[in-house]
């Protein structure tokens, strides 16, 4: 090609529309060079709806969470009005709180995560069934002491709600998400990156260990108080704390240090089992709130150290249960995001840092300085 023809080509290139220039450059590229095949529909810069969104599942999650919260609130109130007769109702109400939190979290983030919380739903259903058996045993031993009224209705309603949640989570599958996964991950993987929440889990584990040690020490102190000798509920509660807190804290720390598929699954299982137990214990000890409120009704208030200690232990239990529920939600969110984006992460090795001289190769093509400079010169000449 002569020099005159070359100039004509450059002038012709300059007169093209801006969008046509990019198309012509893309057509002139070498066959060995890599260009990302991106379409306007693949660019998901603003995601208003989560992937695999289903309105039916979202409505079910929000409705089930609302029903569980309302029923648990009424059950806690009625159980505190009759603290000694309806202790089973407080336990059942407390155990359903993690399921309500998880239902709202699933409806807000990703509805395809419902099957991953099946262990939590099953453990909550087991606790509510135990409370129903507890009610039956109390009714057999002393029929005249229990009024079968609103308490039985609330207990059966909690049982039915948890049974429906377990059935729906068992029947839910992630096949629709897997079918849609190709269209989601082909064009948007370069925009999003799945990262494991290691710092969050480490902070959770530290707080869990501190709160667990404080709760165990407080339990030992409370058991040595004269007023606590009459009831065995404190010893059972503190054994639950001792068993439930430390395995989840250790598993959180180990998983944050060296994340793998096996450890994430184990952490989800442990958190799903311990969270309903911790909230059950906190629901049982919720009568301490009414005792502390009654203390300040009289003036001057007759403060009892035993009631204040029970209230502090209740707050520690709520903190532990909230951290365990948050751990389960974080791990399930990471698991679902990694599965949707087809992220490959080695289940056997810990994350390693890149060498100092290694450069990360991106999918974008190299910038052609010579062609850009010639285009600028021609534009200025015109």
Curated annotation (Swiss-Prot):
One of its GO terms (cellular component) is endoplasmic reticulum. Keywords: Cell membrane, Cytoplasm, Endoplasmic reticulum, Membrane, Phosphoprotein, Transmembrane, Transmembrane helix. Its main location: membrane. GO terms for molecular function: identical protein binding; protein-containing complex binding. InterPro entries: Membrane_MLC1 (IPR033280). GO terms for biological process: caveolin-mediated endocytosis; cellular response to cholesterol; positive regulation of intracellular transport; protein transport; regulation of response to osmotic stress. It is a multi-pass membrane protein. The chain crosses the membrane at residues 58-78, 88-107, 117-137, 148-168, 205-225, 234-254, 263-283, 309-329. Residues 1-28 have a biased composition (Basic and acidic residues). Residues 1-43 are annotated as: Disordered. The modification Phosphoserine is found at residues 183, 185, 188. The keyword Transmembrane helix applies. It is found in: Membrane; Cell membrane; Cytoplasm, Perinuclear region; Endoplasmic reticulum. Transmembrane protein mainly expressed in brain astrocytes that may play a role in transport across the blood-brain and brain-cerebrospinal fluid barriers. Regulates the response of astrocytes to hypo-osmosis by promoting calcium influx. May function as regulatory protein of membrane protein complexes such as ion channels. Interacts with ATP1B1. Part of a complex containing ATP1B1, TRPV4, AQP4 and HEPACAM. This is Membrane protein MLC1. It comes from Mus musculus.
